[in-house]
């Protein structure tokens, strides 16, 4: 698959889940798809334990979709976004496979990662 087709699939899934959950910051989520895709395709590897921290926690849906795309979370789990009693909350939760640190307010990620 090409990068363009991958990012289109990811954006489509973000829009579908935003609509179904009746929540999420659409612009914030769509604006970081390219960045997340490049980082996960080229730098983050499961075996090497390279880690990524998303400080922009309100853009969690794009992060969850990327984690799904790269096999960290299942389609079934992804569909629980925005539902009651789910790990996939509207801000990043460290309880989600592939997530290192819970974030919400802008700027939390930088001091934690240092």
Q: What are the language-model segments listed below?
A:
Residues 1-10:
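N-terminal hydrophobic or amphipathic helices/low-complexity stretches enriched
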Residues 14, 20, 24, 29-114:
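Cofactor-binding active-site loop characterized by glycine-rich and histidine/acidic residues
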